[in-house]
């Protein structure tokens, strides 16, 4: 995790969020304060630190207005482990389905990946050097030792190589390189480092992914799979790949060997406990709607299972136990049918910060198309530029696109900013199809162009074909 990122002030965090997300300033402000409070807590003495727990956030707003994106970007800014789960995927204890503790295990998996990627990045140069050394030996191999060919496994001559050769080391089976081979390797090394051999084919041994077990329930499946992976020896298969691909594979393997996995796992557990963010989407779907019946009872059961995780409990993972007390939980939902007050009182109390996100207006759609650092307009311009087609959007065209997207949302299901993907894809459909045959073309997207391509939905109220 970036140590400097956690020291960002709330204004700095909001400023960075503004580069990717339009509007919703109240939501940005609240998540920025929650993030800053984590830094403040880290500066306190141990006794006070243990008493301060995160103030969880409940985001209320329709789909497509930025709830998930705000939380995801916030986590990315500080390198915190983040997962998004859907409350409707969980079932009460004793029923078939995912148990609520799986969200914590998934978060720890993300934390482990983040920590190991960070550590691998620190030993990247050494790993690449080792990979290049190995590639040189593969491109200019030494003679094999014939006398010891089957010395590693006496059963190999009987079973024809079907037995795993434990402890076999290819380099130990090679004769010391002759002067001629040393000279060739020196020449190959120079060519390799100069990038002249990137497309050359080379045969390497790579670890084979173990097959998944499909006959068990989700959580049971994962636990048994993890246990089997630890018990079974790692099987390697030979593949022929280009040098540039082989370097990546070998460098990753060497980096994996260079890092201390035990301390990395412990660091990941600490990171998940202190900086983890769990985004629980569709939490309104497990709220009781006061209609009674078995469905309400089942929903309350899921809420009561989520409650101890949010309150703080110890969950066992394959890396060790992790305490959820200081994790930040962000609940989100549209709350069209139910209200936040329909959640059980204990769970309501665990989400003390409420923020309502606004529905998107035409002006919001215009800003979404123009302002973000990697806006949709810029994405489509970049995609078509790969075909040497230059696309220019006029301000009038962008406004017209925003008006159509807003109108479609009003006339059908409101899916927020996601509607822009549908509209843009439909408008640029013909151009994307013809682009490979239009080198060096320049296409101006005007309001008239937008109307011509989208007249079927801008004038026709039967918009069912455009509902995502």
Curated annotation (Swiss-Prot):
- Name the residues that bind ATP: 22, 64-69, 281, 346, 418
InterPro entries per the record? AAA+_ATPase (IPR003593), ATP-dep_Clp_protease_ClpX (IPR050052), ATPase_AAA_core (IPR003959), Clp_ATPase_C (IPR019489), HslU (IPR004491), P-loop_NTPase (IPR027417)
A single GO molecular function, which one? ATP hydrolysis activity
Which controlled-vocabulary keywords does the entry list?
A: ATP-binding, Chaperone, Cytoplasm, Nucleotide-binding
**Out of the domains of life, which is the source?**
Bacteria
**UniProt-listed GO biological process terms:** protein unfolding; proteolysis involved in protein catabolic process
From the record, give the cysteines joined by S-S bonds. none
Composition bias, kind Acidic residues: at what positions?
169-178
Annotated compartments? Cytoplasm
Which parts of this chain are annotated as the region Disordered? 166-187
Give an example GO cellular component term for this record.
Answer: HslUV protease complex
Pfam families noted in UniProt? AAA, AAA_2, ClpB_D2-small
Assembly and partners? A double ring-shaped homohexamer of HslV is capped on each side by a ring-shaped HslU homohexamer. The assembly of the HslU/HslV complex is dependent on binding of ATP.
Say which family it is in.
Belongs to the ClpX chaperone family. HslU subfamily.
Q: What does this protein do?
A: ATPase subunit of a proteasome-like degradation complex; this subunit has chaperone activity. The binding of ATP and its subsequent hydrolysis by HslU are essential for unfolding of protein substrates subsequently hydrolyzed by HslV. HslU recognizes the N-terminal part of its protein substrates and unfolds these before they are guided to HslV for hydrolysis.
Q: Which NCBIfam families match?
A: hslU, PRK05201.1
Protein name, please? Answer: ATP-dependent protease ATPase subunit HslU
Originating organism: Staphylococcus carnosus (strain TM300)
Q: Which gene encodes it?
A: hslU
